[in-house]
Amino acid sequence: LDLYGTIRAAVPTFDTYSHIGPQENFEKAIRKAAYFMERGGVFIFDLNTPYKHRHILAGQTFDIEAEDADCHWSNRYDETAQRVDITINIDYHETGEHFHEAFSEYSYALDTVCALLEKYGFAVAKVADGESFGPVRGDSPRWIITAVKQYTQEEKANGTES
């Protein structure tokens, strides 16, 4: 992420930050968002939870048959890497085309995410359950995290952040 100016808000969606890993890359993405964020700027993003990766996706295979295509979606959880490897294959009946995609999602503990946000000048304003928008539960599959930037990079460089 390199921008030509500052931003007042960033709202990555659709599990964007869940796809950033391992943790040093996740931290770098937060650092870059913070670098361009103005004081008072809002950072809102969703993140799949470790619960979802361990208990909903891990080891699961989904076969979906539709009129125009068949989809095979498989998930493999790697506890050591805190990562779900996802493979999706779609076969289109009419054209005979085959689509294949493989990607990973990474798990981060909520306290780790909050600590990284704070490290780069964000105050965590709210963490909500990503399905109900209510309080986070132990079985929440997704979090929506709202953080507010407390100072600019210039203020930090000058030692005037408060």
Locations of regions flagged by a protein language model:
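A short, glycine/Asx- and small/polar-enriched loop/turn
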Residues: 7, 82-84, 138-143
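Short, hinge-like loop/turn segments at secondary-structure boundaries
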Residues: 10-11, 60-64, 143-144
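Residues lining the SAM
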Residues: 13-15
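A short His-aromatic
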Residues: 18-20
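SAM-dependent methyltransferase
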Residues: 24, 44-116
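A short glycine-rich, Lys/Arg-flanked "PGG" loop and its adjoining helix->strand segment in the class I
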Residues: 27-39
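C-terminal lobe and adjacent flexible extensions of AdoMet/dcAdoMet transferase-like proteins
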Residues: 108-162
